[in-house]
């Protein structure tokens, strides 16, 4: 099964929040499916962007349209209730996103408590959109968490050694958004695979927004 580990749906029927003046163009479920049809994609993960904040409406609508082969990666405030977690889990959400690069999510000081709570309650992993140059200072904290992934190969060559150490310890790494990184992608993929053959998850990053 070809699974797209990272994509975005932008549905203007639901709230969008300008990020430093940026608002993405519409990219609905039909646009996404048409884009990936040549690739044979059969499932995927719809990831909330900074411009979607804590809105769940667009994500629930997208998952309902896409069907059970697709899951959601959402942003939630620390005040989220157990009932809300249960409801989102039943709808197909499977992960929590901390967007430390662009904002729109809960902040770093809530990472451990919220990530642990979501994992213990509904089995979710937590995903970090972060410049890998900032990983060293939170490396020990990340290794205390049960299930973590890092977006876009960590973005920066300077922090790649930390990404490799984390991969060795079981942290997953999303191989997507190659236009965002400042290093040779092929070499990084080889190094991450050598560190942990199960670490890499490949995604289209469609429609390649400033998410």
Regions found by a protein language model. Give the residues of each.
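An N-terminally biased module of ancient metal coordination in phosphate/nucleic-acid-related enzymes
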Residues: 1-58
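Hydrophobic faces of well-ordered beta-strands that scaffold small-molecule active sites
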Residues: 3-7, 43-47, 70-74, 94-98, ...
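Conserved, mostly hydrophobic/aromatic
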Residues: 5-6, 36, 44, 59, ...
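Active-site environment of divalent metal-dependent phosphoester hydrolases
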Residues: 10-12, 51-54, 79-82, 103, ...
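Short, acidic/polar
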Residues: 25-36, 78-88, 108-111, 158-159, ...
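Active-site gating/metal-coordination segments in enzymes
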Residues: 53-133, 169-180
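Histidine/lysine/aspartate-rich catalytic loop segments that bind and position anionic ligands
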Residues: 144-146, 150-169
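H/E-rich (His + Asp/Glu) clusters that bind or coordinate divalent metals
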Residues: 161-211
């Amino acid at each position: 099964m070809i699974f797209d580990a990272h994509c975005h749906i932008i549905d203007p029927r639901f709230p969008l929040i300008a990020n430093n003046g940026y608002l993405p163009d519409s990219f609905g479920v039909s646009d996404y499916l048409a884009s990936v049809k040549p690739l044979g994609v059969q499932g995927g993960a719809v990831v909330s962007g900074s411009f979607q904040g804590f809105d769940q409406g667009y994500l629930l609508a997208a998952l309902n349209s896409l069907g059970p082969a697709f899951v959601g990666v959402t942003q939630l405030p620390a005040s989220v209730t157990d009932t809300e977690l249960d409801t989102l889990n039943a709808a197909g959400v499977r992960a929590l996103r901390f967007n430390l690069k662009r904002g729109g999510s809960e902040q770093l000081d809530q990472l451990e408590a919220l990530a642990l709570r979501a994992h213990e309650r509904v089995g979710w992993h937590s995903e970090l959109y972060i410049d890998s140059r900032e990983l060293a200072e939170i490396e020990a904290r990340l290794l205390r968490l049960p299930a973590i992934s890092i977006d876009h190969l960590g973005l920066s060559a300077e922090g790649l050694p930390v990404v490799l150490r984390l991969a060795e310890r079981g942290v997953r790494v999303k191989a997507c958004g190659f236009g965002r990184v400042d290093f040779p992608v092929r070499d990084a993929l080889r190094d991450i695979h050598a560190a942990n053959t199960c670490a890499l998850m490949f995604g289209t990053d469609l429609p390649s927004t400033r998410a």
